[in-house]
């Protein structure tokens, strides 16, 4: 009994331990679409804009040149007469995985030893925070966008045994290998509070209505009545943003089949060849809007991740308690060793802004000390 208790205690402490490598990490964050265009042959096209805001079909469109003035409208942007902020959402620069690989030596020379990638999973948006799927890297980040689509369409999204590796996936796995060959680490963004409108399960609900087996994945307020000309389909989006359908939860977090899907995603990217050695996989996750997902789910998520890779690092985005009044969460409940190793420290950033950037309402050193 004593041996069993000691063993359980050791397992619990291993799960709670922050990986040593993370404590000395010098991070570099990469927004893939805007980092470097390493392969112009895979650049987004006018067709790849479909499925994200703005939804208007464009008669003309082109990749934005990297060195152009951010506020300068391109000829095609001037023709649609919609202004800067509308067109900024349509812009694509062609950044991709090859572009990241090309600059790894440069990053290493800077002293970087850990990379955090904003979302890389398939998505119509430039930011990729509204996923179309989690099982594949965005096809415009890899060398064969058309071939990747053929592979997606041959799979059962719920059955990992049917999942294959696309050209974009394989290039991403090469990126992981190249990162590890330089004694660097890599983590990726996990967005599991919401998805994009083209997400495969949401589209199934949209097409089949109440007959869809994925109805309980989302917060559906009303289904469409085919007997009427109106579309009554209504659902909840993240912070009311209907571009990002929100995942349903109860007091324990998302439902069982969604959890099983995410568990399979964790295993896929944590140990791609499934041999029990996680050295070919990612080194952790940054979890988006983590405070909006139940802690019970994140406790399970941590166990899944650490079962695959005991040295994996988890950091959560724990941000607004009251968005309208700029009140942020105290992140302590997420940092007890059973959920995250760290959080995105927005409270620190906010204090720095108030002390050193905000000249109008600049706080005093004593006030900064209190905030810290």
Kindly give the residue locations of the regions a language model identified.
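N-terminal structural segment of carbohydrate-active enzymes
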Residues: 11-185, 193, 256
């Amino acid at each position: 009994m004593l041996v069993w208790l000691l063993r359980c205690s050791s397992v619990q402490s291993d799960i709670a331990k922050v990986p040593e490598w993370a404590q000395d990490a010098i991070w570099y964050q990469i927004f893939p679409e805007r980092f470097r265009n390493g392969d112009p042959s895979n650049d987004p096209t006018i067709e790849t804009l479909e499925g994200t805001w703005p939804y208007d079909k464009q008669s003309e469109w082109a990749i934005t040149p990297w060195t152009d003035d951010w506020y300068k409208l391109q000829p095609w942007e001037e023709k649609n007469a919609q202004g800067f902020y509308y067109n900024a959402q349509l812009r694509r620069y062609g950044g991709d995985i090859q572009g990241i690989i090309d600059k790894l030596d440069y990053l290493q020379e800077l002293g970087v030893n850990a990379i955090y990638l904003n979302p890389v999973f398939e998505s119509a948006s430039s930011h990729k925070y509204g996923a179309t799927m989690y099982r594949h890297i965005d096809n415009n980040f890899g060398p064969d966008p058309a071939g990747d689509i053929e592979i997606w369409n041959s799979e059962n999204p719920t059955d990992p045994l049917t999942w294959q590796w696309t050209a974009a996936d394989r290039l991403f796995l090469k990126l992981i290998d190249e990162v590890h060959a330089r004694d660097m680490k890599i983590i990726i963004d996990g967005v599991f509070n919401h998805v994009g409108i083209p997400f495969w399960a949401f589209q199934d609900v949209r097409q089949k209505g109440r007959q869809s087996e994925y109805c309980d994945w989302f917060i559906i307020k009303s289904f469409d009545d085919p007997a009427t000309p109106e579309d009554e389909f209504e659902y909840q989006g993240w912070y009311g943003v209907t571009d990002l359908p929100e995942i349903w939860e109860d007091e324990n977090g998302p439902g069982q089949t969604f959890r099983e899907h995410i568990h399979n995603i964790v295993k896929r990217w944590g140990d791609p060849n499934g041999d029990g050695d996680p050295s070919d996989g990612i080194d952790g996750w940054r979890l988006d809007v983590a405070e909006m997902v139940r802690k019970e789910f994140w406790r399970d998520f941590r166990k899944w991740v650490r079962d695959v890779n005991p040295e994996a690092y988890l950091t959560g985005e724990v941000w607004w308690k009251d968005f309208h009044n700029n009140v942020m969460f105290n992140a302590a409940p997420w940092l007890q060793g059973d959920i995250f190793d760290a959080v995105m420290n927005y409270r620190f950033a906010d204090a720095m802004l108030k002390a050193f950037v905000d000249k109008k309402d600049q706080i005093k050193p004593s006030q900064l000390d209190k905030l810290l």
